[in-house]
């Protein structure tokens, strides 16, 4: 049986080196991370170099694996521009165990501060950054016992991480990513992760996976607000009905009510603040792509603690969730879809924050607010079909 053909990485396969000029001075802070035990002083691969290589790979669709990354290190172009030397496969694989992702996270946050939300008069009344929160699953190449999970919807075994993401929708940037095992239970449950990471003065936009009175109470106590989609089976006690305006009706709002949710007999924790239930007419649908996911009966039910905003604006805030879905689509292409360079927790967070930085660099260099067309253009490029589209 013939052996596998060695895949060659050429100069033209490596892209994005010019875009990395802005971030390299920031990466230089990482040089000493993980060197505390290197008493002999013979370390050849440092964290700033490793992160530069990961960033380069995310700009280069041809680099699909750690072995491809190793071959790219042998190119004079890469060694000269990034200041790296040849690295062994073992060094690239094992070095992440001593690299702390926290300093890289700080760099991503600092870079994010340079991207400002563009004024949007429609949402000015919100008075808080609008933060869509959701999670996406990325599979590991190797099977890792502690990451083992069999989701009911798919019915197949997964070894994967869940990346819990906070996405500032008006500026188009992810501001936080936390990696946990994919199974949504215990400390890895999306509601538990968000409750640990709540910040003050934010407007959190949440899907049905974040239904939790305890979580909503915590968000309210932190001085933040939320707009969360409720279950189709939500039952509420109406205490006041708000009159709909013409703008509300034009936005397909059916009802706007102040409500009490929950019963002491069923719920350990009850809401401790005023809540509002807004119903919006939408197109009914079955489970997504034939999977046993939640259906929609034609009414979108939104729960919020913002009693001051028009109902139509609450509906528009929730519609902004499409941005994080498009971000995940692009983000997964940056991560190579199912290909993570490392199955170690540190390595996954480093790669996730590098992908986050690349998305920010795209925003900085294009100078445009993200929209569907921009995300689709980047997505086509990353899957290698942009060139064929241009030729056609």
Q: Model-flagged regions — what are they?
A:
Residues 113-120:
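A short, well-structured juxtamembrane/interface segment
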Residues 150-151:
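Short, positively charged patches
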Residues 75-83:
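Blade-loop segments of beta-propeller domains
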Residues 1-68, 72, 85, 96-99, ...:
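Single, function-defining residue in the core of a domain
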């Amino acid at each position: 049986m013939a052996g596998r053909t060695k895949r060659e990485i050429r100069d033209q396969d490596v892209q994005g080196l010019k875009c990395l000029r802005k971030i390299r001075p920031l990466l230089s802070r990482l040089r000493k991370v993980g060197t505390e035990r290197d008493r002999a002083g013979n370390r050849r691969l440092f964290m700033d170099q490793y992160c530069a290589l990961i960033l380069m790979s995310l700009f280069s669709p041809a680099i699909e694996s750690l072995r491809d990354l190793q071959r790219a290190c042998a190119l004079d172009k890469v060694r000269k521009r990034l200041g790296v030397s040849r690295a062994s496969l073992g060094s690239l694989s094992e070095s992440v165990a001593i690299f702390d992702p926290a300093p890289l996270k700080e760099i991503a946050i600092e870079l994010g501060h340079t991207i400002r939300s563009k004024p949007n008069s429609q949402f000015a009344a919100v008075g808080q950054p609008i933060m869509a929160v959701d999670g996406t699953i990325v599979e590991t190449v190797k099977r890792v016992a502690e990451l083992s999970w069999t989701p009911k919807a798919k019915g197949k075994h997964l070894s994967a991480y869940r990346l819990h993401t906070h996405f500032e929708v008006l500026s188009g940037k992810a501001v936080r990513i936390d990696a946990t095992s994919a199974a949504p239970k215990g400390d890895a449950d999306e509601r538990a992760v968000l409750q640990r990471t709540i910040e003050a003065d934010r407007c959190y936009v949440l899907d049905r996976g974040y239904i939790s009175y305890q979580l909503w109470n915590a968000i309210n106590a932190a001085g933040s607000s939320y707009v969360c989609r409720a279950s189709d089976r939500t039952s509420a006690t109406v205490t006041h009905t708000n009159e709909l305006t013409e703008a509300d009706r034009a936005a397909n709002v059916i009802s706007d009510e102040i409500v009490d949710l929950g019963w002491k007999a069923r719920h350990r924790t009850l809401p401790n603040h005023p809540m509002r239930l807004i119903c919006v007419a939408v197109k009914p649908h079955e489970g997504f792509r034939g999977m046993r996911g939640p259906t929609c009966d034609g009414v979108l039910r939104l729960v919020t603690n913002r009693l001051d905003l028009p109902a139509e604006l609450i509906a528009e805030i929730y519609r902004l969730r499409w941005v994080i879905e498009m971000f995940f689509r692009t983000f997964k292409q940056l991560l190579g879809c199912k290909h993570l360079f490392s199955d170690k927790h540190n390595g996954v967070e480093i790669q996730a924050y590098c992908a986050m930085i690349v998305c920010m660099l795209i925003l900085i260099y294009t100078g445009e607010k993200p929209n569907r067309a921009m995300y689709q253009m980047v997505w086509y490029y990353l899957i290698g079909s942009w060139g064929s589209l241009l030729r056609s």
